[in-house]
């Protein structure tokens, strides 16, 4: 069993509906963790979710309490511009520096793709020059790095049998991803076309990975989310990243 912390994958929404002469507003809150949570439960792991809006109040987190830290669909500004800094101009610890130190001293870390991951929509995720950029096995664009594929794509596996795959043989269909470039010393386990989908490496005393597509809709198609390959992949990633059972 591994202890997993996922930061991100949450959002508020506010809508205006116009019906003829009349209009009204409504809002809500959603999370996008159900598919990962189910996969990790199947693997017997302990899963903790820190929603994006709670980073400002719940950090600092004791990262050593976790075997694997994941960031998904949460931009750099969420970690850097907390009320202490942005509103009151106070100094505080940098969560991204803490994550970088964590992985270099033996922790496991990964970033999952999305509109506010890697470069992100309009470049707003802004991780290209962040404190965690050098811990990831990919080079991140400072610009909008999204590749939208409404027609879908079926990823190819470069290294069949790699422990991070967990035995998965199909990794799609996918409807989009963040375009990344693999670092020289990294292993590209799977690709979307010519672009890395799953990239892994050892960094310092720890391990890190980059998964360029989303862990839920819309980039991950419903048929893939419901497949046994989806759960196999994510449990394989946990096994590889945390070094469970002697994985390579």
Task: Give the ranges of each region predicted by the language model.
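Amphipathic alpha-helical segments in well-structured domains
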Residues: 33, 92, 96, 125-132, ...
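Solvent-exposed amphipathic alpha-helical surface segments
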Residues: 43, 143, 240-244
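Generic alpha-helical propensity signal that fires on short helical segments
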Residues: 22-25, 84-87, 117, 127, ...
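An acidic, glycine-rich "communication" segment
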Residues: 1-2, 12-19, 33, 104, ...
């Amino acid at each position: 069993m591994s202890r997993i912390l996922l930061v991100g994958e949450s959002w508020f929404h506010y809508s205006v509906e116009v019906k003829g002469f009349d209009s009204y507003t409504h809002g809500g809150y959603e999370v996008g963790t159900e598919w990962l949570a189910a996969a990790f439960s199947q693997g017997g792991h302990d899963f903790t979710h820190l929603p994006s809006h709670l980073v400002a109040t719940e950090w600092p987190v004791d990262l050593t309490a976790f075997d694997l830290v994941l960031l998904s669909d949460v931009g750099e500004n969420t970690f850097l511009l907390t009320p202490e800094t942005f509103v009151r101009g106070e100094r505080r610890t940098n969560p991204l520096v803490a994550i970088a130190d964590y992985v270099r001293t033996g922790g496991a870390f990964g970033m999952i793709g999305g509109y506010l991951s890697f470069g992100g929509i309009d470049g707003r995720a802004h991780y290209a020059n962040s404190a965690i950029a050098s811990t990831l096995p990919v080079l991140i664009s400072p610009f909008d790095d999204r590749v939208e594929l409404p027609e879908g794509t079926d990823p190819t596996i470069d290294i069949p049998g790699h422990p991070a795959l967990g035995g998965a043989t199909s990794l799609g269909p996918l409807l989009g991803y963040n375009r990344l470039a693999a670092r020289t010393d990294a292993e590209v386990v799977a690709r979307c076309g010519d672009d890395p989908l799953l990239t892994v490496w050892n960094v310092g005393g720890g391990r890190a990975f980059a998964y360029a597509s989303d862990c839920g809709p819309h980039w991950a198609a419903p048929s893939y989310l419901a497949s046994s390959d989806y759960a196999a992949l994510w449990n394989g990633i946990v096994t590889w990243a945390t070094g469970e059972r002697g994985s390579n």
